[in-house]
Amino acid sequence: MFMARRIFVVLLSFFVMTACRRGGGDNKGELVGVGGKSWKQPTPYGMTLIPSGSFIMGSSDDDKTASLNAPVKTVSVGSFYMDETEITNSEYRQFVNWVRDSIIRTQLADMAEQTGQTSGGGGIGDFAYLDTNTEKMNAYQQYLQNTYGAQKARKLNKKKALIWDTNKYPDEYYSEVMDKMYLPEEEAYNGKRIMDVQKFEFKYQWLDMEKAARARGKRKDFIKEEIVKVYPDTTVWIRDFNYSYNEPMHNDYFWHEAYGDYPVVGVSWIQAKAFCEWRTLNKNAYQKSKGDYTVNAFRLPIESEWEYAARGGLPGGTYPWGGPYTYDDKACFMANFKPLRGDYASDNALYTVEAKSYEPNGYNLYNMAGNVSEWTNTSYDPNSYEYMSTMNPNVLDDNNRRKVIRGGSWKDVAFMLQVNTRDYEYQDSARSYIGFRTVQDFMGISEKQQAKSARGYR
């Protein structure tokens, strides 16, 4: 009898607790779902919402050459956010600096631990791991330390500013760590040593969902780890053009503030993907610090998304602004490209222009034609339009190193600027005329689309 009464009390307590969590038990035994706070997806900074829709992808039969690898096909894409502009030098430098600083802080913390230095003692100890004192660890950190080893519980002291002035290095240990980040003395130029950018490596993991969904195995079998050198290849300005003087662009384009708002180039498809991973990591770290929901991953657009966005709501347009001409009624060019043979400057730009130049298209996207070509997350296959899906179509083949680029660039003729023109480059190649922009999936449908749906069902 006592045991039965005890079980009843336990069950009653469970239902009371559950009812309290549901807001006072007002569900009256009905199926009302699990409670939660209301949520609305915020618009990411610098992005614009592209509503879902259908469009005719590819080239018309009138263009025999282009239709060989891009025959017309009606497809549908979901809603997503897209960067209004190409990723700029300034934005990519934020990524490079984050990687550089993280590597230095990790090496400083390791050196502090090796030499027995702790925070509060000055010198390199100020950069020691925050959990050096195990007595200050919380229960979860102690569990990680005891179960998986020290590295799982490690936290860097990011509040302490790094010291760049050699005259202010706090001690010899700090000097040793910083010295290893620079090129050796024999590679100094005019007596000035610079950082060895080949050491700026970003490590991340990703889950191959495509293979995981179609093959048997453990989750760990589909987790991939990548280590990517993130610094752009500035030599592209020289290598891409023979018998041409472009050294000023090689010397200044990426790092100088004069080009901060210009699109980053010299970035491979592999590096562009790494940037997307970092952007997601960086944003979600902030979200977690505020106790907010994490956001969807930033990524490269698939080819169908890119063309849909480039059209700007004009299904039959030749260019993002419609067309069929590349200049307006005042004879001003609508994009940065090569108008005539050997003529790069008639549009008032010899190379690239600022990322927010010319008029945006109907979706408020700048330079979807010209300036720099853009990486997509699609493998290039001239026959892919024949077999790909009609819903969010995409072909991504790990064995195919050719990746689709779109939009044309400052060194291309008008044909390459057309919204349906396809081109490709190898994923590990960097060029002076290829950049990228990112997208983020939109969860649900937009308020405008909800209103349309409601009107449609009345």
Mark where each language-model region is.
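Short, low-complexity, disordered segments immediately C-terminal to signal peptides
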Residues: 25-37
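Functional-site microenvironments in short loops/helix caps that host divalent-cation chemistry
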Residues: 24-28, 49-50, 56, 61, ...
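Positively charged n-region of N-terminal signal peptides that target proteins for export
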Residues: 1-6
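A short glycine-rich, aromatic-capped structural motif
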Residues: 40-117, 121-124, 132-255, 260-274, ...
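Sec-dependent N-terminal signal peptides
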Residues: 7-15
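Short proline/glycine-enriched turn/loop segments at secondary-structure junctions
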Residues: 393-397, 423-430
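Short, structured beta-strand segments at or near domain termini in extracellular proteins/domains
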Residues: 432-448
